[in-house]
Amino acid sequence: MEKITLAELKERQQISSLDEYTDMDLSHEEDYNRFKDIFPKSVEAIEKLPTDKIYVNTEDLQGDDFAFYRYGSLRAWAYQALEWAFTDDYDEEAEPDNWQTVNVYRLFAGFKEEAVINTINEYWQIEIAELEV
């Protein structure tokens, strides 16, 4: 897992303060209520993820600012991944041979801590790093 200091983040993304970013943890209740019926297994696993470290997007490998200007805990990024999965019509019960959709729960290995950021970075081609505070 890559780490980045606030000074490095400010230099890379030309910000003066983390206040210029959206704190994704502020929408936890909304995220929980939105996805608890759509992705119940995923939400149950996500709720067990830690919230004690901050993660930020440091690079978009698609040449865009797809997930810039936001930060959050591992739990918040997992909910962001559910948002992307929902937008892309992923399913939580899809079988491996179903070529029409992706099983989001399986994609994230049951939302185990070590899989969340690595899967987001690989699957959505961005780079999320832990912010050193």
Language-model features: locations:
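Extreme N-terminal leader/activation tails
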Residues: 2-22
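Short acidic DE-rich linear segments
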Residues: 130-133
